[in-house]
């Protein structure tokens, strides 16, 4: 019993047994049919999630994950010429891969995320990235969302973890104790690119060429729901995903409604 996770996994194979094996029975109940979640929460989910994720989490649908990973990305809808708001507070997603090490710089205003800059440094380490961020943004308040592996990982000499280095530079660091599922990160980004209602709350300034190229070109490995990392498009996407998933996670802690069926 649980939410479907695409076609390429054991739960789909077990579910199909109910259609072909007389010793098995398979049942499908949507969240609405289960009457455990209020209609208001369902409507809120439509605002928070993209169509495929909503179908998976609320409509008990096995969704095909193949081809373009960030399928909700549109050059017409998600790319803007410039950001005109206040950039006093910067939110930066950080991927610790050393070749290249990538940072995605954003502003968040009323749940709208705009990518305004990108940093990509080859053969680098955490100290160098921190120095570059400090040099570029001397007057802004900076919040960094790194890969949770920063709690143990060391990309610089000196014995300090990446998390300790970030804090030593004076950054406000926010990361979970454990890394979120890759698919949850992807679904969170797709949901910001466009929700069920067709509304976009994630935009990219057109000067961020590497972010745009990465989000547009990363695909799944053929016949799987495993993101391809051989092309090098994963680093910027991972950096963005850590930030988005931390602030806008895919919620599954539904609040049950009071049952009135037997009253």
Annotate each predicted stretch with a short phrase:
Residues 1, 29, 58, 103, ...:
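A residue-level signal for conserved active-site and pocket-lining positions in enzyme catalytic cores
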Residues 1-49:
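ASCE P-loop NTPase helicase motor core
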Residues 20, 107-112:
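Short acidic-glycine loop/turn motifs at beta-strand connectors
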Residues 25-27, 92, 145:
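Hydrophobic/aromatic beta-strand patches that form the interior of the parallel beta-sheet core
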Residues 34-94, 99:
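ATPase catalytic-site recognition across NTP-hydrolyzing enzymes
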Residues 101-107:
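Short beta-strand scaffold segments in enzyme catalytic cores
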Residues 112-227, 250-254, 260-263:
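Mg2+-dependent endonuclease catalytic cores in nucleic-acid-processing enzymes, primarily RNase H-like
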Residues 229-251:
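Acidic, Mg2+-coordinating catalytic module of metal-dependent nucleases/exonucleases
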